[in-house]
Amino acid sequence: YGEHKNKNSLAQVGVRVYSSKDLYNWTNEGVALSVSEDPDSEITIGSVIERPKVIYNEKTQNYVMWFHLELKGQGYAAARTGVATSKSPMGPFTYLKSYRPNAGQWPINFSEDQKLSSASDNKLEWWTPEWTTALKNGLYVRRDFKEGQMSRDMTLFVDDDGSAYHIHSSEENQTLHIAELTDDYLGFTGKWARIQPGGQNEAPAIFKKGSTYYMITSGLTGWAPNPARSFKATSIFGPWESLGNPAKGKHSNVTFHSQSTFILPVVSKTDTSYIYMGDRWNPKNHIDGRYIWLPLEINNGKPEIKWQDTWQLQGSTFAE
């Protein structure tokens, strides 16, 4: 699934879907979710639709799409997440709603003291030591408690037991949130956690190997690439341990000119391997954005991504 844009970053068509039986040869299956011509629609032409992700719900037999939505004419102020459903992965997906997650719900890793507002909360200057301390202590969680938490760059993850999670950049892009979805994957249960408060992570991509969860993220440099970050945890809600930059070798400082978007598990009868999928943005011509795919391996408990000019997928293993 990908964002169909023109030269700018606004949605003009919707979310396009491609299919493949071998991960080499791909078919353009058309538009899975169309923007609306109704100017009053939340997904009208000219809104911002980013990071679409689709998961399948075994119980309802629905394909569920979540995405980052910004309302037309509001820049990136809305910070909402939208949801749509379809009986087919090809669509058409029916748009249901958008909102900010977990209104009226405190994170599970938030103390009683953190819930108390301070008289100085609205007077702090950004990037000062006082602001940084307040941010880590939940400044924006408290601010957005009633209306719901901000949700921008996002991904989805379905665990072994069928539980699904919505992982998104929140708190003015300063902190990641991991939020549990309802059994039908169409809403939030209210159980959520703050991850790496004040860590300035976006573009989350998450996967699980054995009983360990791994996550790769990006720093905040707009459309420009930066060194990736990696983390691991034994519980989806953390605590998450920082592992450093998973990219190794030349151009690792810009993650091979990419930003994380998804980690694709490749499953065989005997093993599972993983492919790092990264976006190569072109801010001067957004429709010309590209992907890079590289093998991802776990070495000494840490994910590693190395550049290869060419590589082959053999079952669930990789060959140069």
Name what the model sees in each region.
Residues 1-320:
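Carbohydrate-active catalytic/glycan-binding domains of CAZyme proteins
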